[in-house]
From Swiss-Prot:
PANTHER family: POLYKETIDE CYCLASE/DEHYDRASE AND LIPID TRANSPORT SUPERFAMILY PROTEIN (PTHR33824), POLYKETIDE CYCLASE_DEHYDRASE AND LIPID TRANSPORT SUPERFAMILY PROTEIN (PTHR33824:SF7). SUPFAM superfamilies: Bet v1-like. It comes from Streptomyces lincolnensis. InterPro entries: COQ10_START, ORF3, START-like_dom_sf. This is Uncharacterized 17.2 kDa protein in melC2-rnhH intergenic region. It comes from the Bacteria.
Length: 150
């Protein structure tokens, strides 16, 4: 298993950052390589990704979700093996630190080489930077799910 940890400060309140992160179907607008996400149930999403010519489909189960604090997931079945958590830390009324931690298993030779060269870390950093731009330009979330999964 490989690991990646990245964080970014966003200029919105913690509830705004959290609410936007729960809108999984908007991820393709700021995550490179994510083609589509379907929210199938409150705790199950279906992902279609394509990174450097490697196409994958998989389901991710939300294993823990606490409003304004964290969203944790693990993949179930499909073509990807990963687990992670995104946490939200209030810095002040208008700023939030978003931290992403993920464990993943690179399968193909392309994925293994990309992992060794730091591609996943750079991609994650870029995704968080695009999330920052996405939410700050709007100033508000596109929606939000406030339920808890424990």
């Amino acid at each position: 298993m490989s690991k990646v940890e990245e964080s970014i400060e966003v200029g919105v309140p913690v509830h705004t950052a959290y609410n936007q992160w729960t809108q999984f179907e908007t991820f393709p607008q700021f995550m490179s390589g994510v083609e589509r996400i379907e929210q199938r149930t409150d705790t199950l999403t279906h992902w279609v990704t394509s990174v450097n010519g490697v196409h994958k489909e998989f389901d991710a189960e939300i294993t823990e979700q606490i409003p304004d604090e964290r969203v944790a997931w693990t993949t179930v079945g499909g073509e990807a093996e990963q687990a992670g958590v995104v946490t939200f830390h209030r810095l002040d009324d208008d700023h939030t630190k978003v931290m992403l931690q993920m464990d993943f298993h690179p399968d193909s030779v392309t994925e293994k080489v990309g992992d060794k060269l730091g591609f996943v870390k750079r991609q994650t950093k870029g995704d968080l930077e695009r999330f920052k731009k996405f939410i700050e330009e709007r100033g508000q979330e596109t929606g939000g799910w406030r339920g808890a999964v424990i």
